[in-house]
Curated annotation (Swiss-Prot):
Name the record gives this protein: UDP-N-acetylenolpyruvoylglucosamine reductase
UniProt record similarity statement: Belongs to the MurB family.
Subcellular location: Cytoplasm
The organism of origin for this protein: Beijerinckia indica subsp. indica (strain ATCC 9039 / DSM 1715 / NCIMB 8712)
Oxidoreductase among keywords: yes
Pathway given in the UniProt record: Cell wall biogenesis; peptidoglycan biosynthesis
Encoding gene per record: murB
Amino acid sequence: MFADLIPRLRDAMPELRGELQTNVPLAPWTWFKTGGPAQCVYVAPDVEDLAYFLGNLDPDISIFVLGLGSNILVRDGGIEGVVISFGPSFHKIVIEGDTISAGAAVADVKLASAAAMAGLGGFAFLRGIPGTIGGALRMNAGAFGGTIADILVSCEGLDRRGALHHFTPEEMGFSYRHCAVEGIIFTQGLFAGWPENPEKIREDMGKIAQERAKTQPVNTRTGGSTFKNPNGAKAWELIDRAGCRGLTLGDAQVSELHCNFLVNRGKASAADIENLGEMVRQKVLAETGVELEWEILRVGRPPVAHKTSR
């Protein structure tokens, strides 16, 4: 258990409106359904309260923003400091002409659906990404031939002091699964599409959904794509070549359907999953000479002592 931060935070920010919770289990918040607790969770109701929170937070207290929990592994020792969760105002979508404004907590698939209803093309690829707009901006999320960089007009976010910043696509410095902007909590993005037949868009989204269901372990306890594709190669092919398809450690397994996915078959600890991923990396390096880079974000502390689940 962590020490209770709430009294300290309340003293430092008496006008805070957002909810504070202490020692919050995070396993239910993540798609892997495992991992330790958060020392403190702050639910930000809006940008103004988030800015106030950041502006009055002790700089020695660490922060981490948690969205849908789809591309993250929380280690078994939990996350020290404050985990920030977005409240309702960050879920808003506003459509004006060919542009769509979306809050950081908007699910990628919801933005894709809103664009389809408005007859705006360019967003269908988001149907294949299990995350939120904030996370998509952070890692230049992409799938099925599209990336967030392709549709971004501008975005904004807060720094650690609570100051608001605006960014153009050029200032974001996008590259493969990466943006160059650091130390910013993205709060909103403005995106642009083009007029397209809504039925055509829905048809494209349906094909993406079918392809995901056929080739990926959807509706399982997984964190999505585990490793980034190396230059000129596909991670899953290298993993398969190294003989890792179906490899297990405790209740953690390399998916037999798509071997760039790790799955929790029931009672896997976060350590089981991370250690299995490291085993895969070692085997791929030995077999192919390629060192795979984690795409899943691993955060938090390992436990003091750990026994592999049986």
